[in-house]
A protein has these predicted regions:
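Class I SAM-dependent transferase core
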Residues: 2-99, 107-111, 115, 130-141, ...
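Conserved nucleotide-cofactor-binding alpha/beta core module
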Residues: 91-212
Length: 234
């Protein structure tokens, strides 16, 4: 019984130590992000989302470092700066409808949902175990305006569109006409385009005449898999 009590005390001390580290890292992260991200609403949205809830237990001590983290199944949760950059480029309005391709554990979707309280976020994921994990995490955090869909042969989720904004959270070899067709006129899509090793983050604005492109900078994402993307390994 004494051993059990000692274990409980030790675990409590370790948890308190971790909480202090997360608090310190979180403060440092947002101080850093304020130097490069102009949108206060984006930063406030990210501050409301507990990133540590979206990573495996072993990765929690690094939850507020400005780095991507492994979430299993060969996938990652994006670097906070990249999440902020993508979200800022979308210029979201409260009632917007948003699509994310590549849910992962649901972190980017949660950030998006914070900015569209009167709208909705649809996020699709090909890896079934990740899709279910994202559902569980988002349900636990009471995100009622997010729908997690299992991805199928169709890229995106056209039956729930059109969308005011689209985020592709994985690297694509080229711009997808299927996704552009799901974007409303005046809507924006942010997608990493390139090869498997290096990409350029591209912001696509759909206009009445076609599309215009703006380059946001170099990036590195895990490759998109499935139709109109890299060959699948599943």
């Amino acid at each position: 019984m004494l051993t059990a009590l000692c274990n409980v005390i030790f675990e409590s001390m370790q948890e308190q130590k971790l909480d202090k580290k997360l608090f310190s890292d979180r403060k440092a992260l947002f101080s850093k992000l304020r130097n490069s991200i102009r949108s206060g609403s984006v930063l406030r949205a990210m501050e409301r989302v507990p990133r540590e809830a979206f990573v495996p237990t072993g990765e929690r001590p690094m939850a507020y470092l400005d780095i991507p983290l492994a979430i299993g199944d060969g996938q990652t949760i994006s670097q906070p700066y990249i999440v902020a950059l993508i979200t800022e480029a979308l210029r979201l309005q409260p009632a917007d409808r948003v699509l994310e391709v590549g849910a992962g554990s649901g972190y980017q979707a949660a950030v998006l949902a914070e900015l569209v309280p009167e709208g909705s976020v649809v996020t699709v994921e090909l890896v079934r175990s990740l899709a279910q994990r994202a559902r569980d995490i988002l349900d636990d955090l009471d995100y009622g305006n997010i729908v997690v869909e299992d991805a199928n042969e169709t890229l995106g989720c056209p039956w729930r569109g059109p969308y005011d904004a689209i985020v592709v959270s994985a690297a694509a070899p080229s711009l997808s006409s299927a996704l552009i067709n799901q974007l409303a006129v005046g809507g924006r899509m942010v997608v990493p385009v390139g090869d498997r090793r290096q990409q350029e983050l591209v912001c696509v604005l759909r206009t009445g005449e076609g599309v215009s492109l703006r380059m946001l900078g170099p990036c590195r994402f895990v490759p998109l898999i499935g139709r109109e993307a890299f060959p699948t390994s599943f």
